[in-house]
Each structure stands twice: as C-alpha cells, then as structure tokens.
C-alpha cells in the first residue's frame, strides 16, 4: 500500500480519529460512536446469527475501538497494516486477537468469520478487487460484511469530498457507492442495504446522495 501506511504512527492516527483526550491521545468522536451503534444494529437486523455466537473481524481496525461496540461476540479479531495500531489495540484489549496484515493479501487469521467490518478501509486500497477477494475468503458462507467509506456520486459529493477527505493522502480509491456495490456483487455478495449519510430513509438517500459517506450491508453467498 502507498504512503508507507505500514509505519503510520501516533501522529497519523491522531489526525485520522479527529479527536484527542486531555492527555493528547487519539480518541473517537461522538459521530464515530454513533456510527458504531448503527453498525451493531445493522448486524442484528440482517444477520442470521446472534452476536454471542459470532466470530467478528475488523479489517483496518486501527486502535480497535469499533470492536468495543461488538463486545459479547464469540471472538473479536482485528487486522491493520500499521504495526503501531496493532500494538496499541493489543495492549488496550489483551483478551482480543490482533495481527498486522495488508488487506491486499489473504487474512492472517486461519478462522472464518460471521461478520467482517470494513469501515473506512476500501478507499485506502490500490487494488480494491484484491481487498474484496480477501474479505470474501475470510467470510463464512452467509456472513455479513459491513462497508463504510467516502464516495463521490455527483458534483455535490465531489465538492464535499474535497473539503472533508482530501487532506488524507492515503485516500487513493475514490469510487461512487454504486461502483462499490457492483464490485462486491461481482465477487459473490448480495446487497441487503446501502445508503448515504444521513442513511434514513435509505431509498431517498440513493436518489440524490447529499454526502460522500456510503454504508452498505453485504451478505456472502453460500
């Protein structure tokens, strides 16, 4: 991957998360916490499995905060290309499983998962097809994959993207939400739901997207 993300450190993640504690440490924003709750609700709505019996993988896990929202799952695993992020996540939650890895490559975990979280990660891939194939290979038949990322669908979202996301040089893949959906469907996934911020009602947000943030719920075929 470009921009030496493997060696991204404290400064990069401080900018990435957009909020810091009183001690100057990166932390989640209120919006991120709201989004995480929405992701949990999406899993409960669309999955055939209970959270307590589900194996969960977060690709591009960063410091592992998203997995906090899925506490109570059978297993919680995270993978990130940045050694720093994996170290912080493992120290923060030693009862979980974190490994360093690149989404362009096969999953470093031998097991398969009932839920895979790909939150703000696809836009960092120089080869998104390889990333989606890696996700598919890590997913059990019938698994749910939740995808969230910035996209460009029209002149308005292109302008918003330039104001909200251009500052991150690691955003190298800038598709429309429709393109992302087609890539997943071409790799054997069924689209159960997709929308743009504010995400409700979903069908209205797709008629004319007013924000780059795209959320999709995919299901791996059997």
Residue ranges and their predicted role:
Residues 83, 125-126, 149, 153:
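A structural helix-start
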Residues 1-111, 119, 132, 173, ...:
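Conserved N-terminal segment of class I S-adenosyl-L-methionine
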Residues 68, 126-130, 157:
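Short N-terminal helix/helix-N-cap motif within the alpha/beta-hydrolase-1
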Residues 129-144:
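A short glycine-rich, Lys/Arg-flanked "PGG" loop and its adjoining helix->strand segment in the class I
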Residues 115-126:
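A short SAM/SAH-binding and catalytic strip from SAM-dependent methyltransferases
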Residues 183, 202-208:
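Short proline/glycine-enriched turn/loop segments at secondary-structure junctions
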Residues 172-188:
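Short alpha-helix
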Residues 150-171:
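Short, glycine-/aromatic-enriched active-site segment of Class I SAM-dependent methyltransferases
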């Amino acid at each position: 991957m470009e921009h030496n993300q493997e060696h991204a450190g404290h400064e990069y993640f401080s900018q990435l998360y957009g909020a810091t504690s009183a001690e100057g440490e990166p932390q989640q924003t209120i919006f991120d916490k709201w989004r995480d709750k929405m992701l949990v609700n999406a899993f409960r709505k669309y999955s055939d499995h209970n959270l307590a019996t589900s194996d969960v993988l977060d690709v591009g896990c960063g410091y592992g905060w998203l997995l906090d929202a899925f506490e109570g799952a059978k297993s919680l695993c995270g993978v990130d290309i940045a050694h720093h992020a994996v170290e912080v996540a493992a120290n923060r939650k030693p009862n979980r499983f974190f490994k360093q890895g690149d989404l362009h490559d096969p999953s470093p975990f031998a097991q398969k998962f009932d839920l895979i979280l790909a939150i703000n990660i696809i836009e960092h891939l120089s080869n998104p097809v390889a990333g989606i194939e890696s996700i598919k290979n890590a997913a059990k038949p019938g698994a749910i994959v939740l995808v969230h990322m910035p996209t460009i669908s029209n002149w308005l979202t292109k302008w918003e993207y330039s104001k909200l996301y251009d500052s991150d040089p690691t955003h190298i893949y800038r598709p429309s939400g429709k393109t992302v959906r087609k890539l997943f469907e071409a790799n054997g996934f069924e689209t159960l739901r997709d929308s743009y911020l504010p995400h409700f009602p979903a069908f209205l947000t797709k008629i004319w997207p007013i924000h780059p943030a795209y959320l999709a719920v995919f299901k791996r075929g059997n």
